[in-house]
Amino acid sequence: MSLLAYAAAALAEIAGCFAFWAWMRLGRSAWWTLPGLASLAAFAALLTLVDSPAAGRTFAAYGGVYVAASVLWLWLAEGQRPDRWDLAGSAVCLAGTALILLGRRG
C-alpha cells in the first residue's frame, strides 16, 4: 500500500504544481489553479496512507519518488526525453529512498 500511496502522491503533487506552472509560466487561465489546489490537497492526504509512525521519515523517503516521478513527467507529459544526468540523479534519489525505507531501525 505504501508504494502505491507514494506513486499516487507523486502524481497528485506534480499535477498540482504543473497547474500553477501552466497558469504562471505558460499563460493558461487562472482557473487551472482550482484543480491544482485540489490535486495538492490530495497529495497531502495520500501521504498519510503510508505505513510509517514518523511523518518526517515518510516525507524524506517520498522525496526520491518525487524526483523520479518528475523525470517521468518530463518525458511523458512534456515530451522532453530525460538525459543521462536526469536518470542518474533519479537513481541516486531512489537509492536514498530505499535506504530510508529498508534500513534497519533500533
UniProtKB/Swiss-Prot annotation:
<feature type="transmembrane region" description="Helical">
    <location>
        <begin position="30"/>
        <end position="50"/>
    </location>
</feature>
<keyword id="KW-0997">Cell inner membrane</keyword>
<dbReference type="Pfam" id="PF02694">
    <property type="entry name" value="UPF0060"/>
</dbReference>
<dbReference type="InterPro" id="IPR003844">
    <property type="entry name" value="UPF0060"/>
</dbReference>
<keyword id="KW-1003">Cell membrane</keyword>
<keyword id="KW-0472">Membrane</keyword>
<comment type="similarity">
    <text>Belongs to the UPF0060 family.</text>
</comment>
<feature type="transmembrane region" description="Helical">
    <location>
        <begin position="87"/>
        <end position="104"/>
    </location>
</feature>
<protein>
    <recommendedName>
        <fullName>UPF0060 membrane protein Mrad2831_0929</fullName>
    </recommendedName>
</protein>
<feature type="transmembrane region" description="Helical">
    <location>
        <begin position="3"/>
        <end position="23"/>
    </location>
</feature>
<feature type="transmembrane region" description="Helical">
    <location>
        <begin position="59"/>
        <end position="79"/>
    </location>
</feature>
<keyword id="KW-0812">Transmembrane</keyword>
<keyword id="KW-1133">Transmembrane helix</keyword>
<dbReference type="GO" id="GO:0005886">
    <property type="term" value="C:plasma membrane"/>
</dbReference>
